[in-house]
Amino acid sequence: MKNKIAATILLTVALAVSGCGSGGSDATENTTASQEGINSDLKSAKESSQEVFAMDTYMTVTAYGKNAKKAVDASIEEIKRLDALLSTGDEDSEIAKLNVNKSATLSEDGGYLVQRGIELSTMTDGAFDIAIYPVMQEWGFPTKDFKVPDDATLKELLKLADVSKIDYDNKSREISFEDAGMEIDLGGIAKGYTSSRIMDIFKEYDVDSGLVNLGGNVQTYRTKTDGSKWRVAVQSPEDESQYIGVVDVSDKAVITSGGYERYFEQDGKIYHHIIDPATGYPAESGLKSVTIVSDDGTLADGLSTSLFIMGKDKACEFWKAHSDEFDFVLLTDDDRMYISEGIADDYSSDYEYEVINAK
């Protein structure tokens, strides 16, 4: 899995600094060549780039400008800080302690993410659920000790996956659970929030241009140094070294979710990690992948999984109600592609696709 994630990061970064088009069978060849032929404008700028493994994925931070190294160093420290704060797998983290003690006064970051998680749950009619963690544990996704739970167990655990049972005071940042068995996981928005924090750091250090790739969660700062938009690959859900399209963006997060990211097979059936809070089982929505493009990395992260759970028809209707906040690329199980009109002029693909209009 680590090698696959690293390959994805290389693919996306290569596209982001190159001018290559959308990918077919020669996508890997094109992007490899592009790494050697990065345009001279980017080469001439002062560049700093670092890679780190955090939040169970490889992350790359790249910045251009006179303060690029300082900005990247500060960004790497911020990634490590947020990982230590939010990880459910680290018993010393704020969230792990909350899950044990069932109440806490949260940090500013933790409180912000809990509040956003609650808001996203309301916004998506429960498709986004930070309280789903006990169900995820039963499936074995956090520990990779995979198993298919029985129906009775899932039915009981779903009673705990209820965001309305989280008591949270936004002013004091005090939080508690109404049910002693409840636990939360902020992983569904943590990387998106982290990329947004890095954008704040880039602004603080006044870098000219920048890009972060947090395990496939991409966010761009300004344009490339030559003034052109970043070209961000939309990864293929069937081959991490290929891509299904390219979107040209500046100052945007581009975040993709799909069942291909984490899954296991039992008795000939594949079970992926995107759990539908309504059923407790992996979502069967007819979608292979969902890509969200937004100014807000936290929102993009949360909606990428939420729209995957909704399925194509509900996702399109949801976007029409929130078209000023994000755009999308949907790929269905039968390889039909749908994109929202807000990115139609900036998206290219070898797939045929239908543009969804807001009206």
What does each model-identified segment do?
Residues 2-359:
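Mature catalytic core of soluble alpha/beta enzymes
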